[in-house]
Amino acid sequence: MPISSSFSIRRNAKLWQISTASLTFTVFGRFPELGRVYASATGEHKVAVVDMETFKTIAKTGPVKYPDGIAYAPGAKRVFVSDEHGNADAVIDTTTNSLVATIPLDGGAGNTVYDPGSGHIFVAVHEKNELVTIDPSTAKIVGHYPIPGIESPHGMAFDVSARLAFVAGEENNKLAVVDLANMKVLATYPVGKDPDVLAFDTGLEQLCVSAESRNVTVFRENGKTLVTVGSFSIPHAHTVSVDSDTHLVYFPLQNIEGHPLLRIMEPSRMK
């Protein structure tokens, strides 16, 4: 999905525009502590680094066969990038913006997420139906955890305070709740076909699961289980982001009547 603009979540105002004539950005990782955005430039098989003040591309690093999920480990000062088609996770040193390691996963890399509770990077591995944990400082795999009931895990979100992970399976359209204390699956729930991106509102304890099939399923956390709030359909709504302060939910839509659109919704309307 070509991205041409960004928005201030606080003011819902258009702030800047980046020409993407030669780049297609599919995933952004925005890290204010670095003053940079790391974006997957899939057409070039690289990760682009954009300065948040000047909005200029200051570096490109790779090769990464198909860069997808992006996460930042602050202690190690490293960015980890899912290489979905390369069956690996790529590691970028943010002090030099250079590729310093490639971690083989023996399967397609789904989402990559940093867990501040454990200090580890989590990667969903498609063909292995498991979560892999990585020590950011050594860039070594430190754990393999099967996710029974989930086929081809891809999207992930965490409730860090409750020590829960939510993992969606692309092949069987299920969502798992995983207890991070023991890495056991507590329950699974049906979601829309081809689930992609997950977003968790820490204030409302509410989870959105967006799917390639246009379906969005909304859950409310209830202890260590989930209660379905509702579901609805939005064209191209396979990407979602939430602001836990305002509770607004953002859906960047690729093509609505011939042009990209950012749809912003209040949680009370997502039923």
Residue ranges of model-derived segments:
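Predominantly soluble domains enriched in secretory-pathway, periplasmic, or organellar proteins
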Residues: 1-271
